[in-house]
Amino acid sequence: MTRLVPALRLELTLQVRQKFLHAAVFSGLIWLAVLLPMPVSLRPVAEPYVLVGDIAIIGFFFVGGTVFFEKQERTIGAIVSTPLRFWEYLAAKLTVLLAISLFVAVVVATIVHGLGYHLLPLVAGIVLGTLLMLLVGFSSSLPFASVTDWFLAAVIPLAIMLAPPVVHYSGLWPNPVLYLIPTQGPLLLLGAAFDQVSLAPWQVGYAVVYPIVCAAGLCRAAKALFGRYVVQRSGVL
C-alpha cells in the first residue's frame, strides 16, 4: 500500500503530461455533440452505444498509448528493477484510467439526461466494461515494439470484445452464444441504466460475476505477457 499511493500519484501525473486526460475530456465533448442534438426520446436509445464507444477509447486505446509512451521513454523496462511490484504498477494504471472513464461517462449521462437514469447499473457497466477493455488493451500492446504494428493487430481483439455484444444488444442476432463475450454483461447494464432493457435476476448476476471472473483471468494473462515481453527483454531474467 505504501508503494501504491505514490504509483497512483505518478500515474495521474503521467496521464496529464501525456495529454490523455485532455483527450478524455475531448472525447466527452464529442459524445455530447452527438447526443444533445438528438430528440429527447432517442437519447436513451443511443446512450448505451455511445458509452461503449467511450469504453473502447479510454479503456482500450488509452492504456495501449500509455504502454507505448513508457516503451519510448524506456521506463517500462526500468520498472522491474524498482521495488514496485507488477500488481501495484498495473493497479495504479487501471485505477487512474478507470476513474477517468467513469467520470466522463457520468458527466455525459448527467448533462444529456439530468438525473433520468439509474446510477448503479451505469457505474457497474462502465467500471466492468472499462476494466475488461483496459486489460485487453494492456495485454495486447505488450508484444509490439511500435504503436503502428499494434494498431493493425488491435483490430482483432477490439472487434471480438465489441462487435458481438452490440449485435446481440441491438437484436440483429440475439444468440445466447454471444454471452460468452465478457463485455456483453456491461452493455446489458448500460441498457438497463437507461430503461432500454429489463434484466432478469440471472442476467444481473451474469452481468456482474462473469466480467469479474474474466478480468481475473486477463490479469493473470497480463502478468505472464509482462514477464515475457518486458521482464525477460530487460535482461533481468
UniProtKB/Swiss-Prot annotation:
Gene Ontology CC: plasma membrane
Gene Ontology biological-process entries: response to antibiotic; transmembrane transport
Positions in coiled-coil regions: none
Keyword Transport: yes
UniProt KW Transmembrane keyword: yes
Keywords: Antibiotic resistance, Cell membrane, Membrane, Transmembrane, Transmembrane helix, Transport
GO MF annotation: an example: efflux transmembrane transporter activity
Position of the signal peptide: none
Pfam family, one: FLQE3_permease
Membrane topology: Multi-pass membrane protein
Spans traversing the lipid bilayer: 20-40, 49-69, 96-116, 119-139, 147-167, 199-219
Cellular compartments annotated: Cell membrane
InterPro entries associated with the record: FLQE3_permease (IPR056926)
Record's function text: Part of the ABC transporter complex Rv2686c/Rv2687c/Rv2688c involved in fluoroquinolones export. Confers resistance to ciprofloxacin and, to a lesser extent, norfloxacin, moxifloxacin and sparfloxacin. Probably responsible for the translocation of the substrate across the membrane.
Subunit structure: The complex is composed of 2 ATP-binding proteins (Rv2688c) and 2 transmembrane proteins (Rv2686c and Rv2687c).
Record's protein name: Fluoroquinolones export permease protein Rv2687c
Organism: Mycobacterium tuberculosis (strain ATCC 25618 / H37Rv)
